[in-house]
């Protein structure tokens, strides 16, 4: 039963490959396609043809410097970098990326913002409580004053 499933999936993959090859030859012979797009598509197909497992195995066994040398021109083409010096090989892959911007907030920035908001909340609650206490004290004080004046005026003669 497993052999039938494997053979049917294998045949399905072969059929897909044939369809892709036919489409590829049709693209190559087409009048509207240019040589530049052919090169780009050929490079893309070269990467697609490698299975993910083979790609991962090759990445595990290659030295890091060799990987950066291979990836660097592709990354430059992707992000339209114009620098061709050796500094890009020594730096990280994200250092020259246009996706990496200064707008990204670090975790320390978010913790500082949280501290500011908690301090602001604390200060505002404290001010409200303090003002309400002052209001209560003033109201009680005025009540006592008014009571005292009434008592003084009500003293018998």
Swiss-Prot record:
Domain KASH per the UniProt entry, residue ranges: 104-157
Q: Tell me the keywords, alphabetical order.
A: Membrane, Nucleus, Transmembrane, Transmembrane helix
Transmembrane parts of this sequence: 122-142
Keyword presence, Transmembrane helix: yes
| Lineage: superkingdom | Eukaryota
Q: Name the residue ranges of motif: Required for nuclear localization.
A: 154-157
**Localisation:** Nucleus membrane
Its UniProt domain note says:
The KASH domain, which contains a transmembrane domain, mediates the nuclear envelope targeting and is involved in the binding to the SUN proteins.
Name this protein carries in UniProt:
Protein SINE4
Where does this protein come from, organism-wise?
Answer: Arabidopsis thaliana
